[in-house]
Amino acid sequence: ACTTGAQNTIVGGFTGDAITTGDYNTAVGVHAVGSTTTADSNTGIGYNSLNSNTTGTNNTALGRNSLDASTTATEGTAVGMDALTANTTGEANTALGKSAMAANTTGSYNAAGGLNALQANTTAGDNTAFGVNAMLVNTTGHSNVAMGRSALDACTTGSGNVALGMDALGAHTTGADNVAVGKNALDANTTANNNVAIGTNSLGANTTATGNVAIGTNAMLTNTTGANDTAVGYLALDANTTGEDNTAVGKGALGANTTASGNTAVGKDSLVTNTTGANNVAVGWIALTTNSTGANNVGVGRSALASNSTGGDNTAVGYQALNANTTGASNTSVGYTSLTSNTTGTNNVALGHRALTAVTTSANNTGLGHDAGSIITTGANNLCLGNDSGLSGSPGGTLITDSNHIMVGDGSVTNAHIQVDWTVA
């Protein structure tokens, strides 16, 4: 019976009947705040709410059986039937919704809002779950944030995860330090760690792969076990399954890539049709856009190596450099439209504006300088050095289909100097 306690409000049978010196308590409902003796500033509204509390202070329980097992815990807030019903000594927990944090015993500093949110949590702390069934089966996983219906709802012991959106990280069980923002983001992830998925369905099929970053709707949508990939943009790397160490930035970049690894694509639709080609670099709009299995290519510039399919070991830098190349290999092209007509030619080197721009199927040509060898089509094994070399009016005349020539300079050259005598083999 109350002896010296002051400012208490008691309504209901067997309600607050153990209070002796406790002050500022409010108990409404049968057995509400029924065991409290000296504790202060508790509010229990509903049958059995805060029924077992003895000395815990500053608790608020609204709803039948809310916080009814709590004994000495403080700063708890439970709103809803069976909210925090098993809590004994867990501190500073907030549970809003029927059965929210219903199994929690000693876990502290958790916040749960929504039907069954954090329902199975027992001893874990520092979790935040808002949404129906958010973090539904979590037991000992700590420091997680889940917002959205069924977000992180399968997580049991995983820690340090952030899931924002319906079903975000929905299948996740024990993996740690993942971030999923968007509906179904990382939805199939189970035990993988250190992934970041931002956007609807991003990394949606990922199961055990780690170290991935996917930003954009459907980015890395079908990835399952491919690790250490980065995809930024709508549909970037969206078909990737097991390919690793890829970087895709831009809408559709590396969109068809499945198992290939070590590719870098920056720009809309760059490397968009690549499937198994590895170790390619594409920077620029539709750079290497039709590449499928070609490997070890570098395309930098709009439309660089845009038609390449299976050709490998090519380097193209500049607008439309090696633009028409399909299966040609081991070519180097630096400059505006240099080697732009090459399709199957190999081992060509073009450095300069429009250098070797007309070469199609020939091999082993070198053009260094503005328009160097720019009208050669099928001639092979030519060396053109200097502005307009190999064109009409240049020393030696025009090279188109001829092979095995060395052409130096244009028609304006008046002097040639060399330190030593020429030696004829």
Label the predicted regions:
Residues 1-425:
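Glycine- and small/polar-enriched repetitive beta-structure motifs of secreted/surface proteins
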